[in-house]
Curated annotation (Swiss-Prot):
Taxonomic source organism: Shewanella amazonensis (strain ATCC BAA-1098 / SB2B)
Underlying gene: fadI
GO terms under cellular component: cytosol
Name of the protein in its database record: 3-ketoacyl-CoA thiolase
Pathway assignment: Lipid metabolism; fatty acid beta-oxidation
Matches recorded under NCBIfam families: AcCoA-C-Actrans, FadI, PRK08963.1
Active-site residue list: C99 (acyl-thioester intermediate), H392 (proton acceptor), C422 (proton acceptor)
Length: 436
């Protein structure tokens, strides 16, 4: 049995990425304050369809993701279909794979095309850190259910008397892993300590990311993949990511105090991604259908892989496990790649993964391979800047990486690129893209 992955349909046609688009990414409680993930999702899918000049009725399936879900609209994908002029019979369902969510939605659409179930589909993801499902305490939730069963005033009063003042306080969404109680930042701090990632190296990576992202925006190339978002009540708009430090100064990074280990830590707000609002979407088709409709795809999916590892240590090392799987399925080595895009959740996490890529010991002990994945050539790595600068709306980041990679390879005359991300729960994703 071959290790190669056949990312084609029964006719041998490749899975074409026709176009990709995203909203600007905005820091929490700024430009998209009060705008839900659903509204941003509808916004970007509408604009994607408009720019593609595709009849919405031709879309056969939409798979969309959201990490911080709103109880009022648990199936964000179906709501997007109903809010964007697509046929009401269009199949739609929602997925979540933490920070790799839009990798998952993309793969789901690709696999639907591979099996012949559809020819045209849309994938993507959206998240809002500004519109959050604020909950109630367990005791209050229990009491509210009991109140629905109480028949007399006395019974209701007895239920209220069980509650204290603190039981009435709102409960924000958890920022820690359910299974471990550890936050992503605490895991990044652990990885920095375990793998000897210095504060100086983390700050240097953040500075590099912001500098390259600022240069990329200044060059004008991002305008083709980032829409202008008009924010309700439509008296203002946002046209650019607002987390990027336009004049990043490396010396200024050293002034910030560590966040997750204030005494001995190295992970700061500046070398971590901020809480971010945003949405992204991809239009995918079978190669034959894309050409029949007159489209020139921006890229094709060559291979993909997902990995799952232990959550107690090095939980954000997913790229180091998923990447060798995707490379093997593509029949490639790391040095064969033209470009590499790795999600920078934290500088510490990205640097730790890069270190493991180059480690023969890691390959032997963790991957069962006799050679390292490979040392990353920094001239190929996150050449337009990364998540540290652009921000990270959890479910939207994967599609950003895919779109950005395809467009940059196209500008360079084609090639093959790796996109990869870590994710909460010890998950990892990798996708190899080819561009002509």
């Amino acid at each position: 049995m071959s290790d190669r992955q056949q990312v084609t349909n029964a006719r041998g046609e490749r899975i074409a990425i026709v176009s990709g688009l995203r909203t600007p990414f905005a820091k929490q409680a700024t430009a998209f304050h009060g705008v839900s993930a659903l509204d941003m999702g509808k916004m970007v899918v509408n604009e994607l369809l408009s720019r593609s000049e595709l009849d919405p009725k031709l879309v056969e399936q939409l798979v969309y993701g959201q990490v911080v879900q709103m109880p009022a609209a648990p199936n964000i994908a179906r709501e997007i279909v109903l809010g964007t002029g697509m046929n009401v019979a269009t199949d739609a369902y929602s997925v979540t794979r933490a920070c790799a969510t839009s990798f998952q939605s993309t793969v789901n659409i690709a696999e639907s095309i591979m099996t012949g179930n559809i020819e045209i589909g849309i994938a993507g993801g959206a998240d809002s850190s500004s519109v959050l499902p604020i909950g109630v305490s367990k005791k209050l939730a229990h009491a509210l259910v009991d109140l629905t069963k109480a028949r007399t005033f006395g019974q209701k009063l007895a239920i209220f008397r069980r509650l204290g003042i603190k039981d009435l306080l709102p409960v924000p969404p958890a920022v820690a892993e359910y299974s471990t109680g550890l936050s992503m930042g605490q895991t990044a701090e652990q990885m920095a300590k375990t793998h000897g990632i210095s504060r100086a190296d983390q700050d240097a990576m953040a500075h590099r990311s912001h500098t390259l992202a600022a240069q990329t925006w200044a060059s004008g190339v991002m305008k083709n993949e980032v829409m202008v978002a008009h924010v309700p009540p439509y008296n203002q708009f946002i046209e650019k990511d607002n987390n990027i430090r336009e004049s990043s100064d490396l010396a200024s990074y050293a002034k910030l105090r560590p966040v997750f280990d204030r005494k001995h830590g190295s992970v700061t707000a500046a070398n971590s991604t901020p809480l971010t609002d945003g949405a992204s979407a991809l239009l995918l088709m079978s190669e034959g259908r894309a050409k029949a409709l007159g489209y020139t795809p921006i890229g094709y999916i060559k291979s993909y892989a997902f990995a799952a590892i232990d959550v107690w240590e090095d939980m954000l090392m997913g790229p180091s496990y998923a990447t060798p799987m995707a490379l093997k399925r593509a029949g490639m080595q790391l040095e064969d790649l033209t470009l590499i895009e790795m999600h920078e959740a934290f500088a510490a996490q990205a640097l730790a993964n890069m270190k493991m890529f180059a480690s023969k010991k890691f390959a032997e002990e963790k991957l069962g391979q006799n050679r390292a994945i490979g040392e990353i050539d920094m001239s190929k790595f996150n050449v337009l800047g990364g998540s540290l600068a652009y921000g990270h709306p959890f479910a939207a980041t994967g599609a950003r990486l895919i779109t950005q990679m395809c467009n940059e390879l196209k500008r360079r005359g084609g090639g093959v690129g790796l996109t990869t991300a870590c994710a909460a729960g010890g998950l990892g994703a990798a996708m190899i893209l080819e561009v002509e």
